[in-house]
Regions:
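Extreme N-terminal leader/anchor segments
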Residues: 16, 22, 26, 30-33, ...
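Short pre-active-site segment immediately N-terminal to the catalytic Zn-binding motif
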Residues: 191-209
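Hydrophobic, well-ordered secondary-structure segments
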Residues: 158, 207-211, 216
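Auxiliary, metal-adjacent structural segments of Zn-dependent hydrolase domains
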Residues: 60-189
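Catalytic Zn2+-binding segment of zinc metalloproteases
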Residues: 213-225
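Generic alpha-helical secondary structure signal
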Residues: 15, 54, 58-61, 65, ...
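Long amphipathic alpha-helical segments used for membrane anchoring, targeting, substrate engagement
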Residues: 1-45, 119-151
Length: 225
């Protein structure tokens, strides 16, 4: 603890703020509660349907075997067999958002941990600085920034996923593999809304999305990828 009596807590002399800072300090590298809240806020702005439109889901289901055949013609029999055995799930934007946050949670945790570690150049720059004897206000701001970083990162990631959920056609708008590996996610209502906005035939748009998603799924299932 420094001479000012605050230690690592800039609000050590104020009980209410001190308790709040302790809670923030124990939230880990990324605050997932805030990330989920901001993601849900992003998907709720459009006032979408609580469930997938059955007609849109059935229309996609009928095209899946044809899309599997076309992808198999290019990528081979092994890819066609894998896609024919895959499980296909149909989500609303809000459901896609929740699934994506859970699927990429380990990745975002690793990112947050890496961002929270000082680089070699930054660490070297502070080698000769005695933090205990530095300016109290500067020390307080450094501690406050480190405590707020998980919440701010949670806001950023939650807002990003929430906005992406409003436009995503499937799980490979972000070209990253995700678990479970044998599942393909599709967002029928968003696909149809896009086709309607651009005056495109719905069947053509659905087939394009299916081929894009199935091709990405088949490639990312290759072990060396």
């Amino acid at each position: 603890m420094g001479e000012n009596g605050m230690g690592d807590n800039p609000f050590g002399g104020l009980p209410f703020f001190g308790d709040m800072m302790k809670a923030m300090a124990g939230q880990g590298p990324l605050n997932w509660d805030i990330a989920q809240q901001f993601a849900v806020m992003g998907t709720s702005t459009e006032g979408g349907q609580p469930n997938v439109d059955p007609a849109a889901r059935i229309a996609l289901e009928q095209l899946i075997p044809i899309a599997v055949m076309h992808v198999g013609d290019v990528l081979g029999d092994a890819a066609q067999l894998s896609l024919s055995q895959a499980k296909y799930e149909f989500f609303t934007p809000a459901q896609w958002c929740h699934s994506t946050l859970n699927a990429y949670k380990p990745l975002f945790n690793e990112l947050a941990t890496a961002l929270g570690q000082p680089s070699a150049s930054t660490a070297g720059a502070h080698t000769d600085i005695d933090l205990e004897n530095s300016d109290p206000m500067s020390q307080m701001m450094r501690n406050l920034a480190s405590m707020m970083a998980p919440s701010l990162l949670g806001m950023t990631i939650g807002s990003m996923i929430g906005q992406l959920a409003l436009k995503a056609f499937g799980q490979y708008d972000l070209l990253l593999p995700r678990s479970p590996e044998n599942t393909v996610l599709l967002v029928p209502d968003t696909i149809d809304d896009f086709a309607e906005s651009w005056s495109s035939p719905h069947a053509d748009m659905r087939m394009w999305v299916l081929i894009h998603e199935l091709a990405a799924h088949a490639v990312l299932q290759v072990p060396h990828i």
